Swiss-Prot record:
Changing V53A: 37-fold decrease in inhibition of alpha-6/alpha-3-beta-2-beta-3 (CHRNA6/CHRNA3-CHRNB2-CHRNB3) nAChR. 2-fold decrease in inhibition of alpha-6/alpha-3-beta-4 (CHRNA6/CHRNA3-CHRNB4) nAChR. Negative results: does not inhibit alpha-4-beta-2 (CHRNA4-CHRNB2) nAChR (IC(50)=10.400 uM or >20 uM). Exists in two forms, due to cis-trans isomerization at 49-Pro-Pro-50. The native globular disulfide connectivity of this toxin displays multiple conformations in solution. In contrast, the non-native ribbon isomer has a well-defined conformation. This ribbon isomer is inactive on alpha-3-beta-2 (CHRNA3-CHRNB2) and alpha-3-beta-4 (CHRNA3-CHRNB4)nAChR. Post-translational modification of Pro-49 into hydroxyproline [P49O] induces a 2800-fold decrease in inhibition of alpha-6/alpha-3-beta-2-beta-3 (CHRNA6/CHRNA3-CHRNB2-CHRNB3) and 6-fold decrease in inhibition of alpha-6/alpha-3-beta-4 (CHRNA6/CHRNA3-CHRNB4). The cysteine framework is I (CC-C-C). Alpha4/4 pattern. This is Alpha-conotoxin BuIA. One of its GO terms (molecular function) is acetylcholine receptor inhibitor activity. The keyword Lipid metabolism does not apply.
Length: 60
């Protein structure tokens, strides 16, 4: 039973590597936007209402 578990884990890992590489180009824009939001939060932008509405997707 443990051998079957290991085979499933290894197969899943091997299959996920090529799909991760193929999706890097498509996810580049999403990753950039996410990192921009994190930067705004760390700078305190999302705690001020005008900035939060524009960049953080929240309304007060």
């Amino acid at each position: 039973m443990f051998t079957v578990f290991l085979l499933v884990v290894l197969t899943t890992t091997v299959v996920s590597f090529p799909s991760d590489r193929a999706s890097d180009g498509r996810n580049a824009a999403a990753n950039d936007k996410a990192s921009d939001v994190v930067t705004l939060v760390l700078k305190g932008c999302c705690s001020t209402p005008p900035c939060a509405v524009l960049y953080c997707g929240r309304r007060r």
